Amino acid sequence: MIQQETNLEVADNSGARRVMCIKVLGGSKRKYASVGDIIVVSIKEAIPRGKVKKGDVMKAVVVRTAKDIRRADGSVIRFDRNAAVLINNQGEPIGTRIFGPVTRELRAKNHMKIVSLAPEVL
């Protein structure tokens, strides 16, 4: 459950390390984002010579949340930290690598490029 002002880790090699959610996309009154949802983020911490710099405003896909993800078979998945992958306006990831596991829910929401780059899909 990601909302405005939530801090997230960045799970790719775009150069950003930490981002903050400034808007959840998908409706004017939408408050929360879950895995697979697109949010607007501000980059709070970045490495030198990365593809992005501190202060940039980008879109991102949420790939891991500390809040439970419930599945139809009754199983539950949760992660230690919230994480996102930065994307461009066409929905393609900015980085060329994804760090850490991602969930199957990304496949259902048509983020196939992120799923294919991820080392593990839960």
Swiss-Prot record:
UniProt cross-references to SMART domains, sorted A to Z: Ribosomal_L14 (SM01374)
A single GO BP: translation
Cellular component GO terms held in the UniProt record: cytosolic large ribosomal subunit
Top-level lineage group: Bacteria
Keyword annotations from UniProtKB, A to Z: Ribonucleoprotein, Ribosomal protein, RNA-binding, rRNA-binding
Pfam families the UniProt entry points to: Ribosomal_L14
Record-level Gene Ontology MF annotations: large ribosomal subunit rRNA binding; structural constituent of ribosome
InterPro entries, A to Z: Ribosomal_uL14, Ribosomal_uL14_bac-type, Ribosomal_uL14_CS, Ribosomal_uL14_sf
Family: Belongs to the universal ribosomal protein uL14 family.
Function: Binds to 23S rRNA. Forms part of two intersubunit bridges in the 70S ribosome.
Alphabetical list of PANTHER family matching this protein: 50S/60S RIBOSOMAL PROTEIN L14/L23, LARGE RIBOSOMAL SUBUNIT PROTEIN UL14M
Subunit structure, interactors included: Part of the 50S ribosomal subunit. Forms a cluster with proteins L3 and L19. In the 70S ribosome, L14 and L19 interact and together make contacts with the 16S rRNA in bridges B5 and B8.
Protein name: Large ribosomal subunit protein uL14
